[in-house]
């Protein structure tokens, strides 16, 4: 491909046009190579530009002239290299010149344009500066222009990429208003209309002529006489980028949205762009930049989609889950958005599908719901959804009819069954009265005594037994309504009798069946126990009372024939009707089951399509919609995923079959980007621990990578038992080994999922616990003598016998002290961990407590210091150098002068002070009783208390408080200096940053005032401020980064408006750090406390449960019985020991150590550098939507299993 390395400037007024004409080379030999290097910008921009960066300008861009006129021609002497010449008909445009009073201000004026190009850099040895044809009067202009242009275009050049492979790209960019969040109404349809018209005008060869017509009032840009030479290889697919154009005039006068892109395509053939290949080529290099130590770089993009292709493009993006869309309609109601009708249709389809799904789950025999296939996330077409909607509507109506018919049939069946039971019981009641004459004779033969007995029994107000109550007074009545029969629930039998008896004032008699029968509820199919009742009464008033009581108890009354013959006929008819109803119900259920069985395989597919449709339309409701149907939205995309997103948009564009390709342009914004950390199944649990405290701010140091090591280690320090750690490790390995089986079962138990989700952190906690258990030489409260103890018994047999005899005589135990000079061999020091001799020593707690306490202090101070050093990474990243000077350095010095000094004392005491009398640091050390007390010494250090030097006085006698004196030379002077330095660091931390901010702010204001005065003096006139808002062209400038992101990182809001806020914040931060160093150091002593508690509980479990349980049979005198019981007792004791160890030592103690380790990381460690006030990156991912839908299905299935046999009816 030919290149252009020479530049021809159209001169301004007062310049010599002949000089410009002479710039054109006369032959191809005069052309330099295609590469050229430019300097690092003007002095005013050198802070923004790295001199080592190189840029290739193809074709050369002329930003210092009001009108750029370029002609593609062939060089003389047969050279094929094209070059630029001056267009002879040049008319300068006064409006563009008036836009800026001075050309040096063009690149700084918010109303101006910048000419950008994103090609590869020229090489240094072919610089255009070495061209012999360039005269010295033009050369400074070229250099000045290049410096100014490159300095302003630095960040933009990094983000622009060639739109089509192997083709040149000319970019014209305007600044975006970063402070104005208003989104103006745009007519996106005219963008594409303008592009088509320009595309047609670029199809012919000739002159490429750009005419800029710019005024402050109109702010218009026009393209005139656009022609491309057909012989030029650069005449294809040139791309022009425009940003923050409020009004742009082209042939069709389109109104452009910020960051819109218009493609001008000529008729000459060109290689097609393949976004998929580009994504594969660039994604690997971009992904290497991502790291877990900081959040992924995020970019805000504007996405413009034609309405016909919007669904396919958004659905294709949802397959990857790497885009977070911004809701541009947050102030609008959900019911007033564009695609609310589509959302309602999806919700209605989902409702119908859930209804059908419940029919499948609750049918008999049961059908297991199928799972959704997450491998294929392809979106359904609109035709498929219309067909699905019709099918669901048809199935819903069909099943509603089936349910209603089934309800009616079952209700009739229950009624027939109840009626049959009533007639049977009534027939049994009246079996002894088959003939009417027999009944009359029975009434007349009743004696007076019987009647008196009957009346007396009711005269006392008692309630006789219903089944023993005589019926004689009512049987001879001529009234037809003398009894009522029916059924009622069995559990209401006794209360029904009592209420009816009292309501009728003891004048009605109730008989109920002793045996009950079962009917199924027609709605829920639950079995119901019912019984038959008969109420005997006389009179219309009693009949009304009986009916009201029956209604109150939900009792059903049935008309029963008086004669036995009629009753038997009715029973025969009822039995036949019941058989017919049973056949119809069985046939209906068979048909119903067949439909549901076939439908159970289709429901997951339907549910997936509905959820995809619903999720996509929910995202599309976040877009703003033009009146002509174009959608514009904003989204956050990880920088490493940009190519994948563009490829997804390209695939969606192809699937839609439209002609307008989607637009994806980067935007500048002051809004804080979301935080996105890439994790896998191993690191996810550690990132979740950090995010539970607070999501890190954008690009803030992420504590999760360090937590992977420090969290299990601190846990193991408190849980230091090798045996318990091994059990924990085996449990974690079981979960890891059976991951696929456990996930396939889809267990929804919350407690189980908590342990399963933390399987990898359990594995690390188990490994570190085994390590610390070996350090402590502790396993089930027992030590292992692997390498041989360095201690030995220095007592002979005679001395031991004497001590034993004395212990026997005194009836007490004596402890023998092993003298180190005689009993310890320094050459046989235990190589790893604690010597096993301490496990049987009486003073083991004194030794281990001192060791663990000091080790906890060292570990805590080390982690806090590490956290302070991590804070400097944030300061460097955000270029907050004032924080390094006023916060980081004083904090490190403060920690070093007090707490690191304490750690050094601990280590020195361990190394140099022993039980032997020797000379230590120039002082005669008498022995272990004079070992320096570090805690009291630290207190005396702050109190500046006068102490003795050394351990012996002038007479060689040991001081009474020798452990409180100075134990190394010049200790008082050293400690005084350390205290003074640490106290001097406090005002630096308190006032350093606020005073610096005040100084820089006042200096900046003065510089701005001086610059404004100079500009007014140079122009000689007073220039009124433009009506349009002044914006910065490009990304935010960070000359004074310590006043921008650094403060935002510390406070989380803009603090420049009030200096008092800075003082208050810095005071809080300083007090928190100074007091926190003391309290946090004491907080790390929990490492020692929990380790001690765990060791003591282990010892209690071993000796008091296992050992003592095994020896309980030792007191049995019969050896045979003792030998038989000992294995049983040992098994029982071991079972109790194992149960208590698992429940208390591993579960409870493990949970306690976990929570304490969590607190040490959240408060003591992360408070030194971590704010955690960001917001997470929530990407639009179709798989997550489908998983939520699957959870609803599984929950429905679980509830159906709980209430097995229920039948849904709507």
From Swiss-Prot:
Recorded superkingdom: Eukaryota
Record keyword Nuclease present: no
GO terms, molecular function: ATPase binding; proton-transporting ATPase activity, rotational mechanism
Stretches of the chain found on the membrane's Extracellular side: 737-760, 877-892, 998-1127
Biased composition (Basic and acidic residues): 275-291
Disordered, as annotated region: 259-292
Membrane-spanning residues: 716-736, 761-781, 856-876, 893-913, 977-997, 1128-1148
Coiled-coil parts of chain: 339-405
Phenotype upon loss of function: RNAi-mediated knockdown does not affect embryonic or larval development.
GO cellular component, one term: vacuolar proton-transporting V-type ATPase complex
Alphabetical UniProt keywords: Coiled coil, Glycoprotein, Ion transport, Membrane, Transmembrane, Transmembrane helix, Transport
Sites where a glycan is attached: 1010, 1019, 1118
Matches recorded under InterPro entries: V-ATPase_116kDa_su
PANTHER family, per database record: V-TYPE PROTON ATPASE 116 KDA SUBUNIT A 4, VACUOLAR PROTON ATPASES
Subunit structure: V-ATPase is a heteromultimeric enzyme made up of two complexes: the ATP-hydrolytic V1 complex and the proton translocation V0 complex. The V1 complex consists of three catalytic AB heterodimers that form a heterohexamer, three peripheral stalks each consisting of EG heterodimers, one central rotor including subunits D and F, and the regulatory subunits C and H. The proton translocation complex V0 consists of the proton transport subunit a, a ring of proteolipid subunits c9c'', rotary subunit d, subunits e and f, and the accessory subunits vah-19/Ac45 and vah-20/PRR.
Record protein name field: V-type proton ATPase 116 kDa subunit a 4
Organism annotation: Caenorhabditis elegans
């Amino acid at each position: 491909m030919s290149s252009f390395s020479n530049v021809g400037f159209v001169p301004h007024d007062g310049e010599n046009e002949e000089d410009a004409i002479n710039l054109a080379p006369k032959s191809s030999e005069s052309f330099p190579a295609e590469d050229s290097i430019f300097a690092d910008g003007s002095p005013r921009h050198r802070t923004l530009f790295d001199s080592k960066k190189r840029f290739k300008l193809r074709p050369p861009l002329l930003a210092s002239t009001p009108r750029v006129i370029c002609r593609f021609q062939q060089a003389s002497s047969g050279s094929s290299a094209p070059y630029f010449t001056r267009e002879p008909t040049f008319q300068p445009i006064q409006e563009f010149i008036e836009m800026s009073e001075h050309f040096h201000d063009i690149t700084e004026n918010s109303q101006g344009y910048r000419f950008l190009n994103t090609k590869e850099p020229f090489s240094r040895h072919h610089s255009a500066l070495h061209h012999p044809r360039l005269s010295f009067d033009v050369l400074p202009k070229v250099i000045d222009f290049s410096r100014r242009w490159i300095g302003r275009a630095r960040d933009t050049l990094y983000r622009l990429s060639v739109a089509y492979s192997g083709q040149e790209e000319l970019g014209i960019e305007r600044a975006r208003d970063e402070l104005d969040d208003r989104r103006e109404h745009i007519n996106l349809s005219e963008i594409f209309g303008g592009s088509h018209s320009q595309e047609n005008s670029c199809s012919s060869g000739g002159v490429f002529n750009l005419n800029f017509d710019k005024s402050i009032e109109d702010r218009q840009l026009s393209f005139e006489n656009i022609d491309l030479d057909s012989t030029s290889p650069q005449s294809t697919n040139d791309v022009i980028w425009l940003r923050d154009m409020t009004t742009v005039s082209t042939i069709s006068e389109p109104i452009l949205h910020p960051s819109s892109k218009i493609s001008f395509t000529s008729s000459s053939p060109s290689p097609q762009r393949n976004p998929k290949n580009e994504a594969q080529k660039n994604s690997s290099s971009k992904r290497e930049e991502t790291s877990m130590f900081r959040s992924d770089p995020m970019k805000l993009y504007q996405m413009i989609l034609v309405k016909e292709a919007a669904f396919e493009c958004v659905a294709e993006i949802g397959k990857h889950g790497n885009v977070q869309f911004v809701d541009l309609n947050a102030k609008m109601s959900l019911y007033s958005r564009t695609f609310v009708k589509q959302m309602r249709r999806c919700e209605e389809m989902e409702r119908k599908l859930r209804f059908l799904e419940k029919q499948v789950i609750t049918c008999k025999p049961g059908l297991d719901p199928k799972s959704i296939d997450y491998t294929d996330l392809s979106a359904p077409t609109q035709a498929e959804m219309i067909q699905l909607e019709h099918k669901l509507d048809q199935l819903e109506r069909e099943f509603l009819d089936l349910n209603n018919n089934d309800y009616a049939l079952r209700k009739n069946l229950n009624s027939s069954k109840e009626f049959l039971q009533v007639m049977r019981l009534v027939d049994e009641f009246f079996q002894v009265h088959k003939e009417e004459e027999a009944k009359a004779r029975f009434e007349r033969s009743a004696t007076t005594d019987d009647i008196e007995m009957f009346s007396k029994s009711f005269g006392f107000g008692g309630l006789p037994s219903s089944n023993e109550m005589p019926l004689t007074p009512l049987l001879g009545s001529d009234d037809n309504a003398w009894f009522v029969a029916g059924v009622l629930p069995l559990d209401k039998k006794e209360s029904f009798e009592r209420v009816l008896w009292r309501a009728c004032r003891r004048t009605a008699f109730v008989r109920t069946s002793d045996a009950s029968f079962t009917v199924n509820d027609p709605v829920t199919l639950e079995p119901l126990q019912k019984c038959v009742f008969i109420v005997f009464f006389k009179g219309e008033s009693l009949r009304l009372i009986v009916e009201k009581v029956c209604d109150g108890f939900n009792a059903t009354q049935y008309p029963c024939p008086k004669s036995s013959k009629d009753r038997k006929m009715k029973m025969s008819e009822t039995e036949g009707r019941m058989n017919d109803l049973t056949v119809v119900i069985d046939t209906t259920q068979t048909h119903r089951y067949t439909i549901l069985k076939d439908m159970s395989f289709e429901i997951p597919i339907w549910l997936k399509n509905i959820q995809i449709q619903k999720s996509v339309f929910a995202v599309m409701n976040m877009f703003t919609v033009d009146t002509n149907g174009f959608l514009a939205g904003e989204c956050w995309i990880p920088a490493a995923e940009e190519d994948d997103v563009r490829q997804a948009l390209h695939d969606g564009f192809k699937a839609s079959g439209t002609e307008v390709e989607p637009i994806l342009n980067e935007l500048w914004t002051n809004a804080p980007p979301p935080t996105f950390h890439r994790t896998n199944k191993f690191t996810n649990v550690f990132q979740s621990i950090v995010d539970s405290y607070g999501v890190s701010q954008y690009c803030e140091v992420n504590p999760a990578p360090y937590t992977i090591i420090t969290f299990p280690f601190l846990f193991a320090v408190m849980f230091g038992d090798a045996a318990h750690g091994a059990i924990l490790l085996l449990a974690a390995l079981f979960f890891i080994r059976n991951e696929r089986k456990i996930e396939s079962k889809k267990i929804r138990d919350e407690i189980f999922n908590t342990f399963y989700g933390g399987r990898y952190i359990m594995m690390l906690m188990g490994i570190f616990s085994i390590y610390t258990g070996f350090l402590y030489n502790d396993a089930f409260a027992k030590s292992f003598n692997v390498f041989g103890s360095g201690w030995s018994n220095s007592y002979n047999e005679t001395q031991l016998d004497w001590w034993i005899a004395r212990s026997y005589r005194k009836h007490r135990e004596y402890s023998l002290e092993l003298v180190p000079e005689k009993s310890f061999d320094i050459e046989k020091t235990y190589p790893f961990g604690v010597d096993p001799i301490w496990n049987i020593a009486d003073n083991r707690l004194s030794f281990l407590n001192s060791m663990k306490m000091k080790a906890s202090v060292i570990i805590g101070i080390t982690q806090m210091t590490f956290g302070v050093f991590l804070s400097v990474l944030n300061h460097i990243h955000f270029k907050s150098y004032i924080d390094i000077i006023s916060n980081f350095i004083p904090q490190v010095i403060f920690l070093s002068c007090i707490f690191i000094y304490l750690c050094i004392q601990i280590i020195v005491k361990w190394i140099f002070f022993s039980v032997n009398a020797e000379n230590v640091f120039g002082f005669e050390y008498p022995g272990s009783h004079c070992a320096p007390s570090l805690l009291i010494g630290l207190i005396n250090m702050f109190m500046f208390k006068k102490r003795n030097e050394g351990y012996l006085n002038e007479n060689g006698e040991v001081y009474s408080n020798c452990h409180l004196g100075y134990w190394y030379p010049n200790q008082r002077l050293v400690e005084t200096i350390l205290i003074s330095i640490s106290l001097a660091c406090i005002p630096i931390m308190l006032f350093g940053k606020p005073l610096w901010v005040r100084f820089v702010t006042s200096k900046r204001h003065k510089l701005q005032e001086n610059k404004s005065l100079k500009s007014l003096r140079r122009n000689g006139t007073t220039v009124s401020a433009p009506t349009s808002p002044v914006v910065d062209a490009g990304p935010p400038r960070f000359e004074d980064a310590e006043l921008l992101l650094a403060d935002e990182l510390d406070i989380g809001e803009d603090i420049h408006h009030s200096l008092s806020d800075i003082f208050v914040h810095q005071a809080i931060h300083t007090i928190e750090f100074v007091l926190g160093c003391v309290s946090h150091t004491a907080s790390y002593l929990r490492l020692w406390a929990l380790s001690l508690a765990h060791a003591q509980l282990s010892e209690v479990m071993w000796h008091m449960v296992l050992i003592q349980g095994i020896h309980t049979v030792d007191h049995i005198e019969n050896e045979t019985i003792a030998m038989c019981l000992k294995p049983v007792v040992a098994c029982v004791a071991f079972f109790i020991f194992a149960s208590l160890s698992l429940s208390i030592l591993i579960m409870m103690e493990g949970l306690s150590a976990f929570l304490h380790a969590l607190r040490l990381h959240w408060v003591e460690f992360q408070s030194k550098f971590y704010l955690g006030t960001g917001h997470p990156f929530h990407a639009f991912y179709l798989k997550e939507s489908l998983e939520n839908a699957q959870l609803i299905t599984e929950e429905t299935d679980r509830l159906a299993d709980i209430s097995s046999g229920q039948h849904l009816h709507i």
